[in-house]
């Protein structure tokens, strides 16, 4: 069936662009002339019959001559009319302000209460121990480095140390901690608890005397009325290490403290078994009882050197504890301070110093946290033997090796000190020719052992 001739739209031919009719929006835009009032921008123009485009003088299509203002256009100098705005209720800003103040007040009150609670727990008693200025860091280096003596007070079952319960216990864990704030490092020195200090009476370089009932360093505080300052002065005199603050930890409270943390993840380098307690090698979550066994054990397989091997094992606990604290963050740790300092820890540090230490600690990379121990000559038996007592088994400090260790790692702010300048008793007691190793390690190395155990699947931690 034939069709009529198709009409060709010549406007679309020869690649000529199609003429588009202005939409309402574009038409409205065209009539928004300068100087006209705003209300015209909201007024819909009346429908208009489309007009053919006018020819410009040059014969081209388009031009500005065809634009006409709306029928109701106002004079150019007509007054501008503003939109009416909804009035904000008078009470609304006041309510918002009060709400914000209430929130801020609540936060401030909570923070102040927490700080006051911590400060109350940290306030020393009237007769609290204080360290003499002579053993502290030189004034010119204060703020760059802080040196802290950390001692674990152990209460061995069945032994009555004194009639005053607050003075019971030996300092079986002695840890010298140097916070190098300026250098971004933490260096820790373990001193074996049975290190010989001299006879039962210790005479310091300045003429002061202190007692040591068992000849060993762990009895100094107890032998002098539980005064931790006495131990600090002995360490300063014999090792020439400045001490600014002390921290004592109740080792019997370790169980509760670890349980309050929800356990501590620790890498155990070898199987442990003694007196019915067993821990298997691997990355384990230790509860309080297991942690106590881990840090106190010094017998059984892997403990040929008894106390020295125990010091090496305790490093893995420190590494696990450090990792846990760093993962908690400063805010969560501060929230734990009232419980910790009220029940487990005593110190002469104020809250500002503790907060500064926490912030500094969280910024220290594990590769800059170092552990070492003082080299000693092993096996000096029967010290103080009597007809009814076999005596004590002690170790003799190796002054030469200790001087080298301390000059390498711990005397950045004091300068080197020779073995002769220290007041150690190396030459006062018989000993062998070979001493133990300083066993310098960094926590980053210990963390890697934990990571390797996790990667190999040797862990009881779900998702580790």
Predicted regions and their residues:
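Non-catalytic, solvent-exposed segments at the cell envelope interface
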Residues: 2-43, 52-100, 104-464
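Glycine- and charge-rich intrinsically disordered segments
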Residues: 49
